Amino acid sequence: MTMITDSLAVVLQRRDWENPGVTQLNRLAAHPPFASWRNSEEARTDRPSQQLRSLNGEWRFAWFPAPEAVPESWLECDLPDADTVVVPSNWQMHGYDAPIYTNVTYPITVNPPFVPAENPTGCYSLTFNIDESWLQEGQTRIIFDGVNSAFHLWCNGRWVGYGQDSRLPSEFDLSAFLRAGENRLAVMVLRWSDGSYLEDQDMWRMSGIFRDVSLLHKPTTQISDFQVTTLFNDDFSRAVLEAEVQMYGELRDELRVTVSLWQGETQVASGTAPFGGEIIDERGGYADRVTLRLNVENPELWSAEIPNLYRAVVELHTADGTLIEAEACDVGFREVRIENGLLLLNGKPLLIRGVNRHEHHPLHGQVMDEQTMVQDILLMKQNNFNAVRCSHYPNHPLWYTLCDRYGLYVVDEANIETHGMVPMNRLTDDPRWLPAMSERVTRMVQRDRNHPSVIIWSLGNESGHGANHDALYRWIKSVDPSRPVQYEGGGADTTATDIICPMYARVDEDQPFPAVPKWSIKKWLSLPGEMRPLILCEYAHAMGNSLGGFAKYWQAFRQYPRLQGGFVWDWVDQSLIKYDENGNPWSAYGGDFGDTPNDRQFCMNGLVFADRTPHPALTEAKHQQQYFQFRLSGRTIEVTSEYLFRHSDNEFLHWMVALDGKPLASGEVPLDVGPQGKQLIELPELPQPESAGQLWLTVRVVQPNATAWSEAGHISAWQQWRLAENLSVTLPSASHAIPQLTTSGTDFCIELGNKRWQFNRQSGFLSQMWIGDEKQLLTPLRDQFTRAPLDNDIGVSEATRIDPNAWVERWKAAGHYQAEAALLQCTADTLADAVLITTAHAWQHQGKTLFISRKTYRIDGHGEMVINVDVAVASDTPHPARIGLTCQLAQVSERVNWLGLGPQENYPDRLTAACFDRWDLPLSDMYTPYVFPSENGLRCGTRELNYGPHQWRGDFQFNISRYSQQQLMETSHRHLLHAEEGTWLNIDGFHMGIGGDDSWSPSVSAEFQLSAGRYHYQLVWCQK
């Protein structure tokens, strides 16, 4: 044990937090989570241990701007102005200091290992009583599961130790410091330490004791470590559970270890042995270790599909059977290996349906509770995710247990990122930083290696590639050859990774960056000598309205076996709740706390909002990742299962044929499909529709019974086919009414019954409509070529740094947002049964014509206005965001009804999950409340739209809400939006894709850009 004086002054003088060679003082060795049961039955059933006591709750807290400001007296007693805070928590969430959001740039001046003199310091204290029996025998430990970023610990005024690495436990022996009755802990937490240079992850930078604190009492002679490994024969019919157990304390001949394996109430296998291992070298073997091997016949294998778990109980006892203590863990029999370029689980090639997940809560910062963890897992499972990458640090210990039990594959990642270094590997190639990096990797492995859900180790994130990585890669491969290691830094295919694991590599497009090129994922597989599997560690940047082009990745994954999936970036928006002057909550992002530097809304890349409400893009991910694929041939549906291990035992295929959303026939068939099997389903002869419209066949896989992760009736997969379009049209009855045209100096006015249309002759726009005496328009009907920029349109542009390649900057520079209409033509003609208005506009900026829009409006005796639009696009202007029409309707109706793709928001490059049907939703549901306002709510493939008294028909895309594109563009946060008068309607003949391969470079694929020179579309607008 390291001994230093107890005084605060000496601790401050040592400045351990600015020495990369000091990562801990007196911290105990890493190991799996312990509970020290004194009853083996309680260990088997995982009951709360009487030897494990939580110290979570209210602690006294005082905040100081620097450690030097902390008074020495605090070590002995609470300060008079101390506050009370809840542990675990981040102190920034209690109003102390400010959270800082930055992606790459370090939040402190880069001068490793030194940190600013102004180093916010939180002083925690807790008074507690100790059970006297704990003082009489054994060892009492204190466990801090997570403290950011470094801390010193005192107990009863005496210095205990020091720890850093904010995402792994720091555990200390308190036995020599405790006394009968009342005891006092004092914890001095520093916001910045040399460890902060290894923790430059894209996240909020927060501080404090943010994970659980507990006391653990272990006997003097104790289990100090245990590791379980599962081994198999070739066909997995026989397995061996290998358990290596290490003890600490007096090594006596009478000591024995028994390992028993349980499946529920049934003991499957058991073995007992004394300590003493195999001979290692000429000096012998480990006297304090023993390895037991238990044979298991026909084990029920673990996978994310079927997370079969056993329970291993490790008992330390004497020869006569007297139990000293027991530890236990869940065991999943599974094998992970790479063979012939494929990542295999239990001999089957995996397809990773993965997502990156930060530990984030909008109210609690980086504090994770069980309810939130379970909620995340259930949502992932319900949306066909099977894997999660712990980005970019080891998670709360409970997370892994939950992943074991619910079934998720886990990439466990070391808490190492040096993204802001220049070059990135400045520290990771420096041997002075090897000890700090080593502790972060080795302690992660030692804590988490017993979890079957952990199938891959990761050396960290975005830290370049240095010699330290190579050393740690070799250490893991030596200590745990049962799992592959991945690491993206330095080019994604270095010697420190078993898996090619690029981030944001595209399907077909190379990105030839200097030194670290990102090849297309298809090309990467074919590079000379390359035989590793490729799994994208990050892809499909889900920032705001994004995930365009996601289907293209999944087409490639299914086409090329060695393209084994990837991890979407990322799971949850990292917005935080703030309150306005009236106490109303709102969602904040970088800069909203006065934090500098900051990267604004770049913290919000989630498939779900911070409160776990899904983004529309989540449905697209669910659909592309679904485990059932469908093919239609005639009246035969072929259903293929992509499950590797699971037989469909809780699925029905529901099918329905509908004409323009009206059901004509339906049925339900039980699915009986084995792993990777097929089932043919023959549909009956379908009825012939009697009216015109689109005929669609929709199939849905429905789970009739609830599961551990879904409710009864859960839909896990679906597909639609357009069968035909019935052209047996009933002609409208002839109208004897003829619209009347009147012309004034300023307007053309058309009147039919109680309806009137007014076209302004100076502007050429439809300026007003009346039904009776009620005006229908608040603004004229005008062309629209722009959209409120998406995050993907903005890229890295900001006020102080313009990216001229970003779509929004190209549109601005070309004048798309500033363009004004010059009237070229506005004429009116009376036809035999209609009035025809003809207009032409040149949309110009600074004398340059960007678009020419020619329209005809034909108003007939039925009151239908047929609008034909022809648009010519200048050859030297950027491809526009949309080609359509917009106006502000006077009407505000509660509901919107449409025949088209839905129900969720969809865009041309993100619509495979949408279904063609007749949908009816509240107006409020047509707006997607992205925290950073942008273009949103589009519905594609629309044939008919009904809103209030109005109906539009054609083949178009639309969005409708209380917010104008102008307001969306000018507003920084959704809570600042105000409902405008009336309703804004945007009807597009064409709309550009949204992209999403990444959010910092133009990522809309060419096929989803509006690159043609001419466009035509038609609408029918009438009143019902």
From Swiss-Prot:
Its cofactor is Mg(2+); Na(+). Mg(2+) 2 binds at N598. Binds 2 magnesium ions per monomer. Binds 1 sodium ion per monomer. InterPro entries: B-gal_small/dom_5, Bact_Beta-galactosidase, Beta-gal/glucu_dom_sf, Gal_mutarotase_sf_dom, Galactose-bd-like_sf, GH-type_carb-bd, Glyco_hydro_2, Glyco_hydro_2_AS. The record marks H358, H392 as: Transition state stabilizer. It catalyses: Hydrolysis of terminal non-reducing beta-D-galactose residues in beta-D-galactosides. It is an enzyme of class 3 (hydrolase). Its EC number is 3.2.1.23. Mg(2+) 1 binds at E417, H419, E462. GO terms for cellular component: beta-galactosidase complex. Coiled coil: none annotated. Gene3D superfamilies: 2.70.98.10, Galactose-binding domain-like, Glycosidases, Immunoglobulins. GO terms for molecular function: beta-galactosidase activity; carbohydrate binding; magnesium ion binding. Belongs to the glycosyl hydrolase 2 family. PANTHER family: BETA-GALACTOSIDASE. This is Beta-galactosidase.
